[in-house]
């Protein structure tokens, strides 16, 4: 049986990404994915997030960047994502706008 990709037992290679608002140059969200990274440097998950964010505002306001590649295991990448969110909160006094957890 295949392990669910959100399971902490998932040992696939993951990456950590950031979505940035071009309007104020602020990071809106940190995210993680085990989707393959395509030739354009984006994964399917990051691309879907960008499409959604940009569709809501009606223009190409948000950009994405993969920050760290090749992180083995879902649990490890979640811990890394949380550290990035904590560092952002320490610097800005709040979490990125789209990071709810």
Regions of interest found by a model, annotated:
Residues 1-80, 100-101:
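GIY-YIG nuclease catalytic motif and its immediate N-terminal context
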Residues 83-95:
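Short arginine-rich
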């Amino acid at each position: 049986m295949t392990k669910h990709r959100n399971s902490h037992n998932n040992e696939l290679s993951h990456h950590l990404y950031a979505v940035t608002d071009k309007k104020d140059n602020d990071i809106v969200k940190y995210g993680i994915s085990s989707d393959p990274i395509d030739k354009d440097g984006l994964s399917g998950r990051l691309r879907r997030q960008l499409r959604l964010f940009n569709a809501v505002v009606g223009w190409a306001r948000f950009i994405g960047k993969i920050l760290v590649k090749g992180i083995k295991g879902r649990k490890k990448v979640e811990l890394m994502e949380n550290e990035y969110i904590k560092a952002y909160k320490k610097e800005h006094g709040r979490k990125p706008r789209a990071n709810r957890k």
